[in-house]
Amino acid sequence: MRAQVAVVGGGPVGMLVAAELAGYGVDTVVLEERTEVSERPKATTLHARAVQSLARRGYLPGNGDALGTGAGATSGAFHFAGIHGLVITAPEGEPEPILKRPQAELERLFEQRARAAGARVLRGHRVTGIAQEPDGVRLDVEGPGGPAACRVEYLVGADGARSTVRERLGIASDTAPASVSALAGLATLEDPEALEQGWLRTPRGWIVSKRTPGGETHVRTLDCTGAYEGRERQPTPRELQGEVSRIAGRDIAMAGARWITRFSDFTRLARTFRTGRAFLVGDAAHLHFPIGGQGLSTGVLDALNLGWKLALAVRGAAGERLLDSYDLERRPAARAVVDNTRAQLALMRPGEDVDALRGLFAGLLAEDRYAGGLADMISAQGAVLPAYTERPSSWEGRFLPNFRLPAGADDLVTLLRDGRPLLLLFGEDGARHEEEARAWAPLLRVVRTGRVPGAAHEALLVRPDGHVGWSPGGSPLGGALSAYFGRGGCAPEAAVAAPGGGRGIRLS
C-alpha cells in the first residue's frame, strides 16, 4: 500500500486532516482501528476561533448558513470553572461563537468530505510498527486481510491520548499525574427531575447533568479528593449511581446506565509536535482535563494549521521551515489550553479559600474589562501567531475578521474556501504590490478590489487558515512569499473539488 500521507486515527481531528489534504489533491489514506463511528457521548462544543476557521474552509453545516447576517456582533453565554456569567462574543459577519455538535456528527461530516475529495478511509486497520526513512515513513499495519506494509511520504498521528504514533516514534512528553477522579455516563433516572440540569457544586464534589432528547441524562461527576487507584477498572452502573448520590447528598435512583467511563486531570503535552516526517495532532499531542469545551476546538485548529502546510510540502511548494512552523504555532496554543484548564480545576476544588476565589471571579466576570480576556482565552480569539517573516508588521499573525468586499457579493470567508493563500489588493495603492507577487501567481488567489473603509493597509496576504501572513510595514511582500512558499515558479494549478464544495487547488 502506498500513499503520499497516512493519517493514523479517524476521529474528528484525523478525518479533518484527511479532508484538508485530499481537498488539495494529496493522495491520503486514513488508518482507523475502529470499524465504525462511536456513538459514545464525548465533546459537543466548538468555540469561536475553531468555528470561524471551519467556516473559512467550508465545513460548517449548511455550507456556512450559520454566518452572521451583518446585524452586528453575536454573543453566547458560557462559564469559567463552572462560574456562569462569561460571555463569548464573535465579530459581525462571523458564525455564532459557540457551536454545539456531537463529536460523532462532526466525525461523520469530516469523513464524508474526506472520502468525497478522494481520501481512502480504511477502518479496522491497526498500526503496529513505524519506521522513518530518509524519503518517507514505513508503517506495519494489521487489517481484516492480515498484515500489510504501507509506505508514505509523511505521517500524521491523530490516534488519541494513548497514541501509538507518539509512542513508536519515541516523542517525549511533559506530564502531570491525575489528582482528581471523574465519571461520565448516560443514565436513565427513575425520576427525571431528581437531578437539576446544569452544574451542581457540593462540599463533596461536582455533578454536571444534561437531559438528552431520548430521555436519558448525560451525567458527569468530579471528586477532588484524589485519583482512582484502579484507572483501568471498568466502572459499573452501580458505581455511577453511588457516586452521583454521594455527591448530591441524597439517593439518586437509576434504572440503568451505559457508556460509563472514567477520566481525570492527567495532563500531557508532547515536547514536539513534529519529528522528521511525522506530526502529532489533537489528543495525541496534548491532553488536559475536559473543562471548558476546549479540547475538540484545539484539535480542529491543529488540523487546519497543518493541512495546507503539509499539502504544499508534498507538492513541492513549501520547505522545512513552513513544516516546522506547525510546532512553533500550535504547541504554545496547546500549552495555553493545558494551563487554563489546570487553573479552572483549581477553582473547582472544595474549601473556604476556593469559595472566596470563586466569589472574586464571579465579580470579575461581571466586569467587561476583565471578562473579555477570559472569553478570548477560552474561545482562542485572543491568540496571535508568532512572527514568521524577518521583519513582521503589526498585523502579521493576527486572525483576519470577516468583511465584505466593496461593491461585491464576496466576503473573506467565501474567498478562502478554495484553500489558496489570498492576496488582497485594495485600491490603486494596493495594486502596486501585484508585480512583486507575480512569481507566485499560480499558487495565490489575487483579488483586486476597492478600498475598505477603516482598513489599516492597502494589501494583505492571508494564509489559508485565515491568519495574516503579511501586510505592509514590515518585510517586503516578495520576502514574505519566499519565506512561506519558496522562490516562486510553482507549476500551474489544476482545479479540484475543495472540502467546502467550492474549488481547491492541486499543485502538480
Residue ranges and their predicted role:
Residues 2-4, 8, 23-24, 77-87, ...:
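Helical substrate-recognition/capping region of FAD-dependent monooxygenase/halogenase enzymes
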